[in-house]
Amino acid sequence: MSLLTYNFESEYLNNNHQITVILPDKKRGISPAEFYGSDKKYKVLWLLHGTYGDDTDWLRKTNIELYAAEKNLVVVCPSALNSNYSNWPSAMLGYNMYDYFTKELMPLVYGWLPVSDKREDNFIAGLSMGGRGTIKFAVNYPQLFAAAAVLSAVPVPFDELRPGHPCLIMDTANPRMVQTIENAGGFEAYANSEENVWALIDQLAPTEDLPRLMFACGHED
């Protein structure tokens, strides 16, 4: 496989941003002109890292390059800091990762790389924080993805986030969840936003719009 590292100034993140992309290699017996001049559009996996990670995690810590080669698949790995793949308009000059993903990153990849924008050719997956981002994008933009794999993560349990509810996820050991709710303008605003995955799943479940979903969690997760 070929490896592309691309660093660019993002309008939605208000800083330079880096992505890592795995691309199919030219097969032996095919001329460079034939391969690189082809109009072929490849299927793509949007692969999201977890907390404390970046765009290199999947490449350094897994065999994703081998799996991509087997499937002749493009893999796009963005870097999201510890943003929970949410918009943070009050952070620095604004760090709007949720909007960035669909409004900037995806158009960039479709426009500059040999990647199909058809729903049936687009897949999304992520680990831990990346899993939460995965399910959030999958249910808010079901028209964009054929399937989603949520690894070591589940949608946030909203009833347990209500003020006064005894919930481990709201413990002071997990300040990100508290900050995320404050960032949204409080619990009610948070519950009525794109973050409320449970409500969206309920709306989509009776329809044929929901992407195929896979959830997986290991014994040590």
Regions found by a protein language model. Give the residues of each.
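Non-catalytic cap/lid and distal C-terminal segments of serine-dependent acyl enzymes
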Residues: 1-221
